[in-house]
Amino acid sequence: VTMRRAALSAIRGREISLVFQSPGATLNPVRKIGSQFVETICYHTNLTRREAREKAAAILQKLNMRETERVLDGYAFELSGGMKQRVSIAMALALEPKLLLADEPTSALDATVQKAVVEELLALHREMGTAIVIVTHNMMLSAYMADRIAVMYAGEIVEIGAKAEVMDAPQHPYTQALIASIPRLDEEKELKGIDGRRIDLAVLPPGCIFANRCDRAVAICSMRAPRLQAVGADHHVACHLCGKEDVRDVRQ
């Protein structure tokens, strides 16, 4: 990125916002929530502090938070994990960004709060038109929220496409293994794990990054890295064996 710091600061928060995995690390523990909220809004707008606080309260109410004044006058350590996450999301959406990056937004929450946060994100996406990019290890969350899914392994995209294509007809061995490892209440099958160990990211292999854990790997997999290739109108996979008749689906 060659953009100057001042230009980047104008974009961050205003055009692009980020929700961190740990809401506790996002909020300053020695400053009141309202002070942090107002500072964020005033930095990017011409609103007065009073107007900024009113806007903060309105956003918190939209996220179904009660006693907004008490929340704004309180500190982060006085809030539950779910409330802190909602405050973080509210701060990220305060300026109605065009893009919201959410890093594991539900991983630190219990199931009930997870569902509430997910529904709030989807509702805000519909109402505000904000594009949302979610980073998660939860394939079911991706299946529920996403329009398109990109599966990454060791920092590289190994499969990307429309949700229905990736979830219903996965082509990469890693994607298939991930889906096979999802517990299902309607099936009495033994859970499948992924054999082997992760590669050292400091010493990447010359071939496929998943070859040492893939039960379908052949010689070329260890010698040459595969490139993303189209297997559908909106479906790309990085696998040398993709499309070969002898390739079996590990979910079976």
Where are the regions a protein language model picked out?
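ABC ATPase NBD coupling module
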Residues: 1-17, 35, 43, 165-170, ...
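Conserved ABC ATPase "signature" region
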Residues: 51-70, 122, 179
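P-loop NTP-binding/switch modules centered on Walker-like glycine-rich loops
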Residues: 101, 105, 109-189
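Short catalytic/signature loops enriched in Gly
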Residues: 69-72, 160-252
